[in-house]
């Protein structure tokens, strides 16, 4: 599975041993350098029926894990994308062919895209340093994003502040930007990006969005009305440990970095660790699974920090969790096929939002409830938000539909952010105009 080089060390029971393991893991990562994916391919499989979907699902249970689902088996109408290590390609292709599963090669060599990505980042970093600037059209490390946050807050202190809502498993600060024009107990909107660490386009979109808010306040009537009446909170790096690991070691890491005594594999899927429907369909009890839900609801500090903050605030009216990829806008439920009580309103709002998004660059999104549009998923952010009384709960899946997957070129950051902004603006305006 992803992260195998870091997954074979068993932590001891004491805090001292845990610190020792973390130090050892850091040293090991530094010594080994970034994982190499030369020859790894992303295959796209189109299942004809539920039986073929089940055959694809069986691949996740193989030990050791032989595939990494980028888009898992959901329904026959949706493609399944999976990364296959070079060493497993022959066997996996033979498995697909023997069961009559048609496939195509979406990405011929993942390492080629990774090399291009690193070269683009290095070039951008040199330019930023020489001009003492920050590029919104480039990807950045955790350290660079946190440095930008400090500068951003200092430059726009009249409207933006920084709040630390907790610490990650590896003791990174969990930071939230608060956009506010003052006043007490304003109703609020929550936006988070990067809960799955390899989805870099989401962090970049969040950063651009933050800058858009301060740039357009006072100029864009809709945004100005929103911010005069409501506060906006943006968590740019929801999974800081995992995100740092995607830069230092494994670009394709999804989960957080929590470790537990006696468990060989590292990390929990933070979007399966919420209380609503915890442990149900669409999550996994196997710690080595990419959708491992963790030992208990909100066991992960990254999730608990959000729950505690939103609950203590008590006046959030919308929550928007931004993921990639697939070009979708969805609302609850994920764990149930039954519609929520205000399903018609959410459907109409999602329709308006994707229409606004489409007008920017002509990118098409599909929309609907999570369980009927994508797949059944339990213990997810938006289900928890909705069950906690946040009426307008949405989840984005940003660009693209599989040509690059999680390795979306930096040249697409700005257009992705621009179109996403129009959808966000639509949702926020509706929230403003429909108080509850």
UniProtKB/Swiss-Prot annotation:
Active site: 397
UniProt GO cellular component terms: extracellular space
Domain Peptidase M14: 138-431
Pfam families noted in UniProt: Peptidase_M14, Propep_M14
Keyword Signal belongs to the record: yes
Keyword terms of this UniProt record: Carboxypeptidase, Cleavage on pair of basic residues, Disulfide bond, Hydrolase, Metal-binding, Metalloprotease, Protease, Secreted, Signal, Zinc, Zymogen
Tissue expr: Expression is very low or not detectable.
Positions contributing to Zn(2+) binding: 196, 199, 323
Coiled-coil boundaries: none
Protein name per the record: Carboxypeptidase A5
Organism in which the protein naturally occurs: Homo sapiens
Lineage: Eukaryota, Metazoa, Chordata, Craniata, Vertebrata
Protein encoded by which gene: CPA5
């Amino acid at each position: 599975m992803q992260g195998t080089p870091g997954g074979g060390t068993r932590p001891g029971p004491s805090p001292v041993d845990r610190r020792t393991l973390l130090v050892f893991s850091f040293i090991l990562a530094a010594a080994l350098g970034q994982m190499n994916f030369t020859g790894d391919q992303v295959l796209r499989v189109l299942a004809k029926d539920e039986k073929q979907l089940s055959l694809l699902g069986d691949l996740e249970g193989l030990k050791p894990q032989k595939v990494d689902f980028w888009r898992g088996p959901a329904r026959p109408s949706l493609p399944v994308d999976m990364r296959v290590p070079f060493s497993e390609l022959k066997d996996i292709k033979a498995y697909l062919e023997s069961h009559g599963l048609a496939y195509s090669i979406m990405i011929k060599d993942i390492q080629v895209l990774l090399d291009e990505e690193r070269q683009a980042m290095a070039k951008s970093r040199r330019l930023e340093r020489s001009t003492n600037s920050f590029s919104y059209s480039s990807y950045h490390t955790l350290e660079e994003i946190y440095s930008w946050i400090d500068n951003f807050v200092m430059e726009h202190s009249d409207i933006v502040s920084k709040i630390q809502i907790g610490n990650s498993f590896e003791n990174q600060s969990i930071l939230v930007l608060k956009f506010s024009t003052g006043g007490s107990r304003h109703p609020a909107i929550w936006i988070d990006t990067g809960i799955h660490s390899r989805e870099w386009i989401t962090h970049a979109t969040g950063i651009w969005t933050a800058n858009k808010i301060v740039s357009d306040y006072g100029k864009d009537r809709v945004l100005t009305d929103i911010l005069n009446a409501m506060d906006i909170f943006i968590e740019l790096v929801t999974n800081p440990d995992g995100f740092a690991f995607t830069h230092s070691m494994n670009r394709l890491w999804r989960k957080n970095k929590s470790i537990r005594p006696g468990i060989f594999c590292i990390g929990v899927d933070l979007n399966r660790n919420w209380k609503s429907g915890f442990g149900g369909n669409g999550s996994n009890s196997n710690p080595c699974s990419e959708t491992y839900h963790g030992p208990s609801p909100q066991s992960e500090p990254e999730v608990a920090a959000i729950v505690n903050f939103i609950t203590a605030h008590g006046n959030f009216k919308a929550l928007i969790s931004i993921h990639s990829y697939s070009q979708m806008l969805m609302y609850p439920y994920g764990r149930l096929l039954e519609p929520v009580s205000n399903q018609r309103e959410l459907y109409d709002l999602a329709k308006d939002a994707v229409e606004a998004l489409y007008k920017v660059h002509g990118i098409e999104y599909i929309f609907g409830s999570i369980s009927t549009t994508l797949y059944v998923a339990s213990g997810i952010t938006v289900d928890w938000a909705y069950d906690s009384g946040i009426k307008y709960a949405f989840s984005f899946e940003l660009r693209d539909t599989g040509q690059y997957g999680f390795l979306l070129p930096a040249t697409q950051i700005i257009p992705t952010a621009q179109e996403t902004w129009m959808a966000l603006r639509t949702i926020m305006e509706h929230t403003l105009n429909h108080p509850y």
